[in-house]
Amino acid sequence: PLGCTVITSDIPDSSANLEVIKGNQVEILNVLGAGDAFMSGFLRGYLRNESLEKSATYANACGALVVSRHGCAPAIPSEKELFYYLDNAHNILNPSQDKALNHLHRVGKRSKAPTEIYGLAFDHRKQFYDLAIECSVDPGHINTLKQLLVHSVEKAIHKTNISQENVGVLIDDTYGEDALNSIAGKPWWIARPVELPSSRPLAFEGGGSIGSKLQSWPLAHVVKCLIFYHPDDPIELRLKQERQVKELYSACIQSGHQLLLELIPPAKYKDDITTIPRTLKRFYHLGINPDWWKLPALQDQSWQLISDIIFSHDPHCQGVLLLGLSASMEAVKESFAIASKYEICKGFTIGRTLFYDSAKEWMQQQINDQEFVSSVANNYIELIEAWHDCKRTY
């Protein structure tokens, strides 16, 4: 019979005298790590003074899950994953193909998310390029500008008591590679874009395999993808975009990177409180569970719908971050006042609202490097304080 025995005294002369604690039959794809998994499961119960039978049940399940996957120690299940499997093992004949189980395994390996994120987004490429052309400046200067934006974040940290774990940045590797390299090793939340700017249908920058591209990224870097999407788009366009997002999500599952999906409805559509909620529901129905969502300013009704949808479809989602869409500081603060009421909203990643005017002045040589850094840092601090004020209210 399948399973194991626990011997607490002398070893009997015959295995027929041993009590077998049965496990579950699975297809064996790999044998490496099975022993480690078995012992980790057993100790999970034994060290909590649970019965030997219960401890052995955990051991059998952990071993079964590891041998059914192409992996070694990283394939060992988390506690939530283990209990889900034990509750549903009779319906899970092939654990490696069970989507719910695999999702629990994926989220169980994530590092702990910051409670809040105060993000400065400067992963813009087209907007910076267009600004450089408008100001008759060599686009090569954008690289320097993005390094200065890193200094703005550092200055804001120095002037406030915010934790570095709550600091976020969105930086591209087209113009921001030096900026990215300069923050290597910092405990900041870092996200990088993969979308070709302004593409609709969605295309990935640089072409080729998105999975191959992610292989060179540090695992701590979050994959950010902006998609201009509306659930009422023409069916051909919608399916093309959805295929791209599914490909990206699969690549993130394979690479182990977290995914932030940014949704912006095209301006041609009339604003509707159900647009974003319907979009989220559509992606969840497609089996796409991003770790993060990045969403525009919304009304109370939309936030409530979004909260219900996320908690219903993926209670392990890290949360929602607000985007700015180049709105005024006052408009952004108004969006904070609404979003901060909802537990699912974890903060913001705002860009042009904080730096665009100063970037233009810098390119036109109306301000120097230090003035630019200070201006953006002060704006950034102002938004962080505004977010804190809103959260204290609720």
Label every model-predicted segment:
Residues P231-A251, A297-H313, M329-V332, W362:
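Active-site-adjacent beta->alpha loops and helix N-cap segments on the catalytic face
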Residues L120, E262, W293, G351:
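Conserved, mostly hydrophobic/aromatic
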Residues P187-I190, S255-L259, Y269, H313-S328:
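Short beta-strand/loop segments at the ligand-binding rim of alpha/beta enzyme cores
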Residues L180-I183, Y269-Y284, Q299-F311, V332-F336:
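Distinct, well-ordered alpha-helical segments
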Residues T144, L148, K240-Q254, R278-R282, ...:
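Alpha-helical scaffolding segments of alpha/beta enzyme cores, especially the outer helices
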Residues I92-D233, N289, Q318, E330-A339, ...:
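Alpha/beta catalytic barrel-like cores
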Residues G168-D172, P193, H221-F228, D233-Q241, ...:
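Catalytic beta/alpha-barrel core
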Residues P1-D98:
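Conserved phosphate-binding/catalytic region of the ribokinase-like
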